[in-house]
C-alpha cells in the first residue's frame, strides 16, 4: 500500500488552473471607444499564455484621456484610473485566487500607456476592501511591455489562499500611473514628435488562477518541439556562444530533461517543475562560430511525454565590416567678401 501511495503521489504535480474568462466581468473608470474593459479579460489577442502585439491596439483596454483623480469607491485608493474585475456573479461566493497574471498594454509604439505604479485591492462583498501589498510596499510596479510578439506576462502576483469576488487595480496619480515619465525630457519629446497623448492608460490582459495538484496523466502531453536559432552570440568564458530558443506545443508542468547533440558535441539541460508551465527553453550552443549549416538532435524526456527531433540549423549570418579612410581639407571661408 505504501508503494502504491508513493507512486500515485509521484504522478501528481502542482498546476495553476485559469479561472474561465467567461466568469470574469471587467469595468473601468473610463474606456476609449473600441477598447473596452472586457477586451482585457476575454482572451482577445492571447495565444496560449502569450499576448500578440497589435498595431492598432485591438483586444486591449484603453482609458479615455485622464488627468484628474478618481476612485472606484470611498473605500479604495485614489488614482488616475481604476480597473475592476468581478469574479463570478454578485450572488456567488468569493473565489480562491492563488495567482494573478498581468500582460501590460502591448500596442506597438504605445507601450508607455501601460499601467506602472498600481494599488491592488480586493473585496468579498464590494464594500469592505483590503490592500494587497508587495512586501513592504503598498503598491506594485507593472513593467512596461517590451513589445515582443508574442509577449509573456509582464507581472505575476502570487496570492496563495486569497479569497475575493472583486479585485480593483488603481493606477497612481501624479504622473506615476503609466510609463510616460513626465520628468524625462527625451520621453516627452518622443511623445510630442509621435503625436502621443501621455494621459491614456491601458492593459492587454489579466488572468486569475487557482492552484491544485493534478494527475500528470490529465495534463496535455508534450509532443512537438520547434527551434529558432538566433544570429547573435553571447560572450562566455569558453568563447562566443550562439543563442537558440526551443518551444513546446504544450506547457511543461512536471519538469523535463533535455539532451542535445550537434557536430559531435553533446550537452544536457534540465527544466524544473513549474506550476505556471514552461513553454520555451532558451539555451546556448557550445562555444564557437557556426559558419556552416549543422544538424541538431534534441531529446526531451518528461512525465508529460518524450520527444526526439532533428533540426537543421542554418549557418549564422556572416558580417563584413569595411573601414573607409576619410580626409578633410579646410578650404577656409567660402563666402564672397565685400570690398
Please state what every model-predicted region is:
Residues 1-5:
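Bacterial N-terminal signal peptides
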Residues 10-26, 43, 48-52, 155-158, ...:
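Mature N-terminal, pre-catalytic/accessory segment of carbohydrate-active enzymes
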Residues 11-15, 52-133, 151-217:
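Aromatic, loop-rich ligand-recognition surfaces of beta-strand-rich domains
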Residues 27-30, 35, 123:
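Short linear Ser/Thr-Pro motifs
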Residues 32-65, 336-339:
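Short, polar loop/linker segments at the starts of domains and inter-domain junctions
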Residues 107-111, 142, 332-334:
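A generic structural signal for short coil/turn motifs at secondary-structure boundaries
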Residues 137-146:
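Surface-exposed loop and turn segments in beta-propeller and other repeat-based domains
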Residues 327-339:
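The substrate-binding groove and active-site-proximal loops of carbohydrate-active enzymes
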